[in-house]
Amino acid sequence: MAEITKADVVAFIEKMTVLELAELVKELEEKFGVSAAAPVAVAAAAPAAAAEAAEEKTEFDVILKSAGANKINVIKVVRTLTSLGLKEAKDLVDGAPSPVKTGISKAEAEEAQKQLVEAGAEVEIK
């Protein structure tokens, strides 16, 4: 039996009438349990959902981008903020960019950022 290529399928479909194409689409939808119209409706709703999520952000992450010149002071602040041991705090600072605190309130994130910046670190809130 000869192999059917994509080009053969396209050539066959080109010769079909609109009515035959509509019936083919309906049969394919039934056979595979899909709908040809669903992606259009979902794509239209997605941007609205994304906008709502951006407005309702309640949890923030404090990301240490770099320790700057005062690495020791930054390590001290990281230990205070996270209750990590000296080695763990040093590893976190050395591994920048890395998250210092995750899933915290905006006020807490801004306070942590303020303390880290005062110690000489470069910080980002996401």
From Swiss-Prot:
Q: Name one GO biological process term.
A: translation
Extract one GO cellular component term from the record.
cytosolic large ribosomal subunit
Q: Which UniProt keywords apply?
A: Ribonucleoprotein, Ribosomal protein
Annotated GO MF terms:
mRNA binding; structural constituent of ribosome
Keyword Hydrolase in annotation? no
InterPro entries from the xrefs?
Ribosomal_bL12, Ribosomal_bL12_C, Ribosomal_bL12_C/ClpS-like, Ribosomal_bL12_oligo, Ribosomal_bL12_oligo_N_sf
**Can the keyword Acyltransferase be found in this entry's annotation?**
no
Give the family, as the similarity comment puts it. Answer: Belongs to the bacterial ribosomal protein bL12 family.
Q: What does this protein do?
A: Forms part of the ribosomal stalk which helps the ribosome interact with GTP-bound translation factors. Is thus essential for accurate translation.
Summary of subunit composition and partner proteins = Homodimer. Part of the ribosomal stalk of the 50S ribosomal subunit. Forms a multimeric L10(L12)X complex, where L10 forms an elongated spine to which 2 to 4 L12 dimers bind in a sequential fashion. Binds GTP-bound translation factors.
Name it. Large ribosomal subunit protein bL12
Q: Which organism is it from?
A: Trichlorobacter lovleyi (strain ATCC BAA-1151 / DSM 17278 / SZ)
